[in-house]
Amino acid sequence: MPEYPGISRDAFRHPLDQQAEAALRAFPGFDIVARKFVEFMYERPQYVSLMGNSVQVGPQQYSTLYQMFRECVQSLDVRPTPTLFVTQNPMVNAYAIGEEQPCIVMHTGLLDLLSDDEIRTVMAHELGHVKCGHTTLTQMAIWAMTTASVIGELTFGIGNMISTGLIYAFYEWRRMAELSCDRAALLVTDDWRLVGNTMMRVAGGSDRFAHELNFAAFEKQADDYRNLDEDGLSQVYKFLLYNGGGSGPMLSHPFPVDRLSYL
């Protein structure tokens, strides 16, 4: 596994991540005020909850995962070393939280589906969030969104206009942040096909039919999806799908085929 001692987040951050973060931070007072709120009202309760309700990975607990995780941490030179937790959940997912006490959480559903190399890929992706400082920004944004909503109620709806703009900026940044973390996974694994295959497995992998998954077909699917942009109406549909469109939630992640194309 390659190692990058002293690597800066700017060495691999996607330009779209940087641009979207700049837009999000443009809201006055967003950064300074929210940081202290996160420290005392968000990060610590999350850590206490994980300690009480999940399994903390260590040398004597999920030792194989612990060794894999340590290698990924060393590869990206992530400091301080995050704590890894496994939580009982069939949903194929993992996430990163915290800054003072950064944590990576992996669902059992993900561990049961993926191979060791694919699990390393996910670990590296989540460590990318920690390395890039995404965890704090996500928590700050959630707090700011809630605050803007409350202000809207107290100011006869005026603050809701602020809230709407902030929500759009937040979700746009969250999606672009994933592109940086896919790059982090690529740095650690040094295997583009492995990262792409992991995306495919998370998107629609099946243990029973794993032998029938075809990465070349998934690549073609990504190309076909991108070619839909030649039709203006399809571009509108894509925008609506990402941004709620009145019938669903805004998406926090780009579609897997989009991520594959960006990678």
Predicted regions and their residues:
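Hydrophobic or amphipathic, alpha-helical segments that drive membrane association/targeting
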Residues: 1-100, 168-170, 206-207, 227, ...
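Short pre-active-site segment immediately N-terminal to the catalytic Zn-binding motif
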Residues: 56-60, 105-121, 169-175
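Post-HExxH zinc-binding segment in Zn-dependent metallohydrolases
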Residues: 143-178, 185-188
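Active-site-proximal gating segments in proteases and membrane effectors
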Residues: 29, 86-97, 166, 186-263
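An active-site-proximal "capping" alpha-helix that borders the catalytic cofactor pocket
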Residues: 69-74, 174-196
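Catalytic Zn2+-binding segment of zinc metalloproteases
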Residues: 127-146, 153, 192
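Divalent metal-coordination and catalytic microenvironments
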Residues: 69, 106, 125, 181, ...
